[in-house]
């Protein structure tokens, strides 16, 4: 059986932290920012930790 390949698109979007959590950038923060208020656009530029519901699935994609 061949080795499992990691999902290249997921590897570009998600990173594993030193403690093992999965970090990712938020969506909707790159364009059409004039429609969004300052508080929202500021928060969209901060990275966040992935919630536990999707963590197992993403971990298999990036660490395979």
From Swiss-Prot:
Gene3D superfamilies: 4.10.410.60. Pfam families: Ribosomal_L35p. Keywords: Ribonucleoprotein, Ribosomal protein. This is Large ribosomal subunit protein bL35. One of its GO terms (cellular component) is cytosolic large ribosomal subunit. Residues 36-45 have a biased composition (Basic residues). Residues 27-47 are annotated as: Disordered. GO terms for biological process: translation. HAMAP family: Ribosomal_bL35. Belongs to the bacterial ribosomal protein bL35 family. GO terms for molecular function: structural constituent of ribosome. The keyword Ribonucleoprotein applies.
